[in-house]
C-alpha cells in the first residue's frame, strides 16, 4: 500500500471515530473508546495500512492510552487465530474494529453484524461478500479499496510494446481479489485485441515455474 492509500485509511478512521465519539456507548475506563485492530499477517503493505490508521487517529487527537484504547492483534495467517480474535473483540464490545486484509474483514463481519468495522487492503467488498454495494455499503462494514488500475496497466504495456498480442498474468488461484483483477484485465485487454494468458500459483515457491511456463507460451 502506498502513502496515498495509507492516508485514505487514516481519513476513513477519523471519520468513523467521529461518529463513534458521538454515540457514547461501550466506553472503557475514563471514557476511552475501545478500538480493535485485526491484521491477517505481518507484511509491509499491511503494516503500512496499520500505521496509517494509528497515525491518522493521532493526528486528530485520538491517542492510545489517553482517549482511546488500542488492541492490536495479528493472526499470523491462521484462520483459527482470526476466529479467536474476532470473538474476543465481540465479547469485549469494541467501539470500532479495523480489519486489515480480506480474510480478517470477512471473519470479523461474520462475528458481528452491528459492530462498526472498517476494512483496508481489500480489493472488492462486494466480491468478498462484505457489502451489497461498494458505492453505498450500508450495514456495519465500510472501508478503503486497494483495487489495481488494471486498465491503466494494460495501456502502459501497449505504450511500451505497441505490437503486444499476449499478456501473461501470474496470480494466486485461491485469492478472490486476484481472480477479480485478472478477469477485469482480460475483459479490457480483449477490447484492445490482446489475449491474457493465465498462470496460477499456490504460494511464492510456484512463481518461478509459472513465469517459465508463460515464457514457453511465447508471452
Which residue stretches match the model-derived regions?
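Extracytoplasmic "Venus flytrap"
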Residues: 35-60, 71-80, 174-178
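An alpha-beta-alpha
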Residues: 35, 53, 142-192
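Periplasmic-binding protein-like
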Residues: 36-38, 89-101, 118-120, 167-170, ...
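Immediate post-signal peptide segment of exported/extracytoplasmic ligand-binding proteins
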Residues: 24-36, 60-67, 137, 158-166
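Structural motif
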Residues: 69-91, 200-215
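Pocket-lining segment of extracytoplasmic ligand-binding domains
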Residues: 170, 176-219
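Beta-alpha junction/loop-to-helix N-cap segments that form part of ligand/metal-binding clefts
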Residues: 76-132
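Short, low-complexity disordered leader/linker segments with a strong preference
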Residues: 1-34, 59, 63
Amino acid at each position: 500500500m502506498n502513502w496515498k492509500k495509507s492516508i485514505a485509511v487514516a481519513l476513513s478512521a477519523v471519520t468513523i471515530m467521529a461518529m463513534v465519539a458521538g454515540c457514547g456507548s461501550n466506553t472503557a475506563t475514563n471514557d476511552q473508546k475501545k478500538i480493535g485492530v485485526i491484521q491477517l499477517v505481518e507484511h509491509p503493505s499491511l503494516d503500512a495500512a496499520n500505521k496509517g490508521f494509528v497515525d491518522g487517529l493521532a493526528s486528530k487527537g485520538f491517542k492510545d492510552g489517553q482517549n482511546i484504547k488500542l488492541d492490536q492483534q495479528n493472526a499470523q495467517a491462521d484462520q483459527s487465530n482470526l476466529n479467536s480474535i474476532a470473538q474476543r473483540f465481540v465479547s469485549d464490545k469494541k467501539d470500532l474494529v479495523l480489519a486489515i486484509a480480506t480474510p480478517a474483514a470477512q471473519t470479523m463481519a461474520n462475528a458481528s453484524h452491528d459492530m462498526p468495522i472498517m476494512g483496508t487492503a481489500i480489493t472488492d467488498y462486494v466480491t468478498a461478500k462484505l457489502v451489497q454495494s461498494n458505492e453505498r455499503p450500508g450495514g456495519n462494514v465500510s472501508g478503503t479499496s486497494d483495487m489495481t488500475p488494471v486498465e491503466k496497466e494494460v495501456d502502459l504495456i501497449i505504450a511500451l510494446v505497441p505490437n503486444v498480442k499476449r499478456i501473461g498474468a501470474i496470480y494466486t488461484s485461491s485469492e478472490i481479489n486476484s481472480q477479480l483483477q485478472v478477469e477485469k484485465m482480460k475483459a479490457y485487454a480483449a477490447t484492445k485485441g490482446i489475449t491474457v494468458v493465465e498462470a496460477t500459483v499456490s504460494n511464492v515457491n510456484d512463481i518461478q515455474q509459472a513465469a517459465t511456463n508463460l515464457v514457453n507460451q511465447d508471452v
